[in-house]
């Protein structure tokens, strides 16, 4: 027999993850580590830092990874040391917090979002939308709200940014090791992973479920990157905002359809269903199916029930920022739903179109508006922008009349206030501040704190940031093979005593990061003034598909390398939550320059406010409401030029002028103690008069007061007695819709001729209207609408609506009368409209049937 020289098969590997096992006495550390309570409770994070300072740093503040890497020797040292008592104390505080039961007097909420910014350790966020959602969960926990959240556990999350030496952004996608993250996998009773089966076109997608404990609030994350799925489907939860439009469709289908199926599987049912952006709109498609299949409701009845418990929050100020899907692509994924709902495909897809019956793409936002009873923007100004943006959905009404409201965004103060700041507030303002953050009286005491103490606090935070900038900038420079001698020269130019202005955000072109660099000669004079030194630090990521945003980054990096700007303009790579916390607490001024009104809210400036950092911003988003003279600086909200390039040049000149004549002189009006009393007064005013209005506590309270309670009450009302009111309302709407075209205006007169000279101010006019409803059974209302006309701007704005009084009803005829007296002279337009009336309607847009009639 011939003997082969080699006989071996391929290695057979099994993935295993080795980690340290904690002794029983240290088990509380695991419990604390897997609950994100430690993110905003300093004693928790401090505890892990003390256990192993180097490990804490190398794991980037990940307590789970730290404990898994802890040496046996270090464990024994902890057990033998007084650290054990400290662990027990922190654990006792943690348990006391966690064990508080939810406040059942507040409505329960299911919250859906594509991203959550909770900690840099969990890379399931990209920017402001996610960080806001993360802050919301933290405050819901602190406020003891019965809330659960739904999202995705991304394998790669959002990208890590590095910059080449010439400033070109490089996007790196690094896989997350789920076993080393502060989360737990949801298991079945037999200890095996719970698997959710979601029907996709021609196949089933299998989903694992993970739970992140955000204090008292559970966040359930779906994960398709498992062996049961094809590579194509495993990638559904690979990247946040990655891939093509089909991948986006697959993701939003999973978030909506799969999200509701997951809650059903977990046995979770809430009173309110909150869509954080249109990405989650399809939750209502699955909820409709559930009510039809489980409760025997018709489509229209189910729609009443679903709408009454649903809220849609829009974060996007322009139509182009919303998701639209081609009918073919949308139909591949949602084609079976009309059959489940008992309606036609045309009726179903029209729910996502501004103009039903057209060939428009399916809009997730329009579908959300049609299936959610309430909707809101994220600042007062954005609420107004949203009304104009969504006006085509309700063509019988004008933007200012729409039900679209607003809740101005806020930030979770315990997360974003630096540790030193929180300690300072506790010492100087009292711990009650943390329990009642939106109460201005709790903040007013800052006016009584000595100027010197505030200045010392600000300098402490600034020096920490400067130290970090030096280390991070040097590491990035050397990593990119930059000239070592040059980086030393740059670092030497960084002056801790100089006025430091920060700019950190997503690099979208409308954010106008380039604005400061419009006139480089003027900027060079400003930053090279030896008597009044000033420095700028920039940071931010551009979406990998956004060439314009990446070009802005490259442009700024190139400028920062010029001799006149070395050490004066600094760009830091890889903007994330950790870097954000350092910046918004360490700079002196936070700069924001968006094109108005494209900043829906913006929250980075609010985070700066919590730390006594002053804002210098365009009057847009939250700053439009928040700006207080003597507590920050603002660029005017007035637009001088239609040409954006000219407007940019004017705004840039305004920035330079404000720096030269207000900000820099105020900062450098220093006394013998080395600080400017005027500058400190700005800080005091900012903390006392602005900060309390922009906490997440105030924001959550607003959602409760403006939407959650209202929806919960209505939902309970129409669902009572086997959905009695919902069924009645659906039947009434069906009847009105069927016979709407049958009613006729029999007569419509005014007691005086309005066609010759028009109405006279102060004179009384009487209108009489008779309507014959014919087959229409429901009640009707009528009103006069007066619009003021601005001939220069070619705009109309409603100034008055006057309701006709129903005088009598005879058979199918309705007799109305209106007596009115004009009160304002000028160019006006006057019109009359008829609409259906039912006391069960929450607002007119809920059933927007309108007929305009002619006098």
Give names to the regions the model predicted.
Residues 1-855:
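Catalytic cores of carbohydrate-active enzymes across secretory and cytosolic contexts
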